[in-house]
């Protein structure tokens, strides 16, 4: 889920609704045919994402404390990522794939200090921490 939110934040222009909870089985062939508390929550979340910070919302069958916390973490992550520049995405993408700052600098044709500046401006460390937090809190909300 966090990976999908990250990819859609990078693309921009999307409203993202995340539903937590159970789904009816067997799973439907098409999402429109699916049902269960998670699907109903996701549909509500997509509507709630309209005008929400980061254009994202997390909802559950009962929007209790765990769901509200997961929502807050995902909103913070999407808001941070939505402010990231193309240069920031480029630098974080290389480092996320395991390149060192020096190797990323070589790939980008810039200095290592310029890579460091891009990573700071992109909130790379904050984004990684927010993604980990969102993952944990979404897991808690889905229990």
Q: Which ranges hold each PLM region?
A:
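Regulatory and interdomain segments flanking nucleotide-handling catalytic cores
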Residues: 1-143
């Amino acid at each position: 889920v966090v990976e999908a939110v990250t990819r859609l934040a990078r693309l921009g222009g999307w409203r993202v609704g995340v539903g937590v909870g159970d789904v009816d089985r067997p799973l439907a062939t098409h999402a429109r045919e699916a049902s269960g508390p998670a699907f109903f929550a996701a549909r509500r979340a997509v509507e709630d994402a309209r005008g929400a910070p980061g254009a994202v919302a997390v909802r559950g069958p009962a929007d209790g404390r765990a769901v509200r916390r997961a929502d807050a973490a995902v909103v913070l992550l999407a808001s941070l990522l939505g402010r990231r520049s193309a240069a920031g995405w480029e630098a974080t993408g290389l480092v996320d794939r395991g390149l060192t700052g020096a190797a990323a600098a070589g790939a980008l044709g810039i200095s290592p200090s310029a890579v460091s500046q891009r990573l700071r401006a992109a909130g790379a460390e904050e984004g990684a921490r927010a993604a980990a937090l969102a993952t944990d809190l979404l897991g808690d909300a889905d229990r």
